[in-house]
């Protein structure tokens, strides 16, 4: 049997936790504009599985690619990197 390939990981900020055991994570990346050369911020949202419902809005989390869990969920929360400050 062959070894499993290294899974993709991303670090992003939780933008929504309204769903049961699911959070929406916004991952920001910087790309260079193909024509003008300027660095542009690009944000992509991922739905990620949060088994313990531990994530709050504003938390910085690490997510890892996994098998499809639903129509749109293919990521899971690995760890909370930084908790949000509640004011």
UniProtKB/Swiss-Prot annotation:
**What Gene Ontology molecular-function terms does this entry list?**
rRNA binding; structural constituent of ribosome
Q: Name one GO biological process term.
A: translation
Query: Which positions carry the signal peptide feature in this UniProt record?
Result: none
Q: Which UniProt keywords apply?
A: Ribonucleoprotein, Ribosomal protein, RNA-binding, rRNA-binding
GO cellular component, alphabetical, reads:
cytosolic small ribosomal subunit
Query: Does Transferase count among this protein's keywords?
Result: no
What the entry lists under PROSITE patterns is as follows: RIBOSOMAL_S17
**Pfam families attached to this UniProt entry:** Ribosomal_S17
* Gene3D superfamilies linked to this entry: Nucleic acid-binding proteins
Q: How does it assemble?
A: Part of the 30S ribosomal subunit.
Free-text function comment from the UniProt entry: One of the primary rRNA binding proteins, it binds specifically to the 5'-end of 16S ribosomal RNA.
Matches recorded under PANTHER family: 40S RIBOSOMAL PROTEIN S11 FAMILY MEMBER, SMALL RIBOSOMAL SUBUNIT PROTEIN US17M
Q: What family does the Swiss-Prot or TrEMBL record give for this protein? A: Belongs to the universal ribosomal protein uS17 family.
Name under which the protein is recorded: Small ribosomal subunit protein uS17
**Originating species:** Heliobacterium modesticaldum (strain ATCC 51547 / Ice1)
